[in-house]
Amino acid sequence: MTLTAPPRLLLVHAHPDDETLWTGGTIARYAARGVQVVVVTCTLGEEGEVIPDNLRGLAADQADQLGGYRVGELRSACAALRVADQRFLGGVGRWRDSGMLWEKPGQASALPDAHPRAFAVGDADEQADALEELLREFRPQVVVTYAADGGYGHPDHIRAHEVTMAAAAKVPDVLRVFHAVPSQGVVKEGLAALAEAEGMPFELPEPHELPGVPDERITTVVDVGEHLPAKISALRAHGTQVKMWLEQWNNGAGVAAYALSNGVAQPVVNTEHYVLATGDQQGCETDLFGGLGVSGTEPVGAR
């Protein structure tokens, strides 16, 4: 297959910061190779917990201004990753962060009383129609979202999966849909490296306490090592949600970790992982565009 249209990648994420946490290296890699990368964010992340003491008044149970603040964080992160365009599903503020509860380490569930505008309880058909409109506008060949379980059970991630699968099925331009997933094996290796690092300030979890899928289920492993500096810059842009730690970091080499508000370490690794949900698997082992006949694998300067 050879495509005459330029390569375009669209990623559907639930909240500001998810684009970086789940797919930041991938975004930076393809943007550096001339791919038009579009991020669709489904909510403003209004229900997020706030890490810095001096900003906790923004939280939903106080001034309820966190969503607007996180829009600025998202813009900074997208600039660091060189995102071509970022849109909010249905427009800014159409759907609200649904919030979540932790059932156990690494597994979330829905709140018992959702906000009336909560994304997870909104009209799924309206949401799918809004995404279909964006898919027809940008015409991506490749779309990325979460797996059916949302990665770790967050209701907004689950709804993002449902909406994406429904909308993408209606748009012929979409040739592949991938689910972003953590690799159990890579998470385990990353945690082992953090255990050997001196001065790592976060709580070190057991591997099974972090989300992950068996490596045999993974269809695509994207090397993002060259683009970790961009991902780390984007992680730092989400300062209300993410804390970063680096040891002997030098242009992508070293040990790095981040933690969310729970203070639990998660390793920054050189690869990001995907499961092909729809489309032809041939050629996609290391490249989301592999086998599609588009220039999505070579750096722009090498063409």
Curated annotation (Swiss-Prot):
GO terms for molecular function: N-acetylglucosaminylinositol deacetylase activity; zinc ion binding. Zn(2+) binds at residues 15, 18, 157. Its cofactor is Zn(2+). Keywords: Hydrolase, Metal-binding, Zinc. Transmembrane segments: none annotated. Binds 1 zinc ion per subunit. It comes from the Bacteria. GO terms for biological process: mycothiol biosynthetic process. Pfam families: PIG-L. Its EC number is 3.5.1.103. The keyword Hydrolase applies. InterPro entries: GlcNAc_PI_deacetylase-related, LmbE-like_dom_sf, Mycothiol_biosynthesis_MshB. It catalyses: 1D-myo-inositol 2-acetamido-2-deoxy-alpha-D-glucopyranoside + H2O = 1D-myo-inositol 2-amino-2-deoxy-alpha-D-glucopyranoside + acetate. Gene3D superfamilies: LmbE-like. Belongs to the MshB deacetylase family. HAMAP family: MshB. Catalyzes the deacetylation of 1D-myo-inositol 2-acetamido-2-deoxy-alpha-D-glucopyranoside (GlcNAc-Ins) in the mycothiol biosynthesis pathway. This is 1D-myo-inositol 2-acetamido-2-deoxy-alpha-D-glucopyranoside deacetylase 1. It comes from Saccharopolyspora erythraea (strain ATCC 11635 / DSM 40517 / JCM 4748 / NBRC 13426 / NCIMB 8594 / NRRL 2338). The lineage of its organism: Bacteria, Bacillati, Actinomycetota, Actinomycetes, Pseudonocardiales.
